[in-house]
Amino acid sequence: PATMIFRQNTTTQGGARAGLEFVQHDGGREEAGFRGRADCVVRAICLITGESYNHVREDLSYLQKKMTGGLYPSIADGVMTPVHYLYLTGKGWELTLTKNAYLPDIPRDGHFIAVIPRHVMAIRHGTVWDAWDSRFSRRTKSGYPRLLGYYSPPAA
């Protein structure tokens, strides 16, 4: 199995978190002929890897069906966490778990797939690439969503 790294909250100098920029992008969903919701994992993977939406969707659907014994044959209602974990780590991605961290605490130097509660998003050099502006949360005092962890791409 893949290695997991734990990363503590890393606020910027002086304790202030710098904001993240946002770019709206559907990851190729519309071009592939899909509409709707619950495809954040597919979008994030496509936006970071450049793979086609259909290819990633087919791979994740197959893996979810296989991992659940056919109980969940489709990813139409979303991709289960163990499925995207196995998919990404199987391709050499490394998961870093974060403790007491919020979205702005993600590293700014590179491409990552961020995992927040009930959502996954692409981060490119400190900019959120997503179908909707997912940078903020009303559920936390800071106004930012908790960062549960992030995937880093395989070393070149």
Whereabouts are the PLM-identified features?
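Active-site nucleophile-adjacent alpha helix/oxyanion-hole segment immediately C-terminal to the catalytic cysteine
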Residues: 4-74, 91
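Glycine-rich, aromatic-bearing surface loops/beta-hairpins
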Residues: 136-156
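Solvent-exposed, well-ordered amphipathic alpha-helical segments
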Residues: 6-8, 17-18, 105-112, 123-128, ...
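Conserved active-site-adjacent core of cysteine acyl-enzyme catalytic domains
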Residues: 64-118, 124-133, 141-142, 146
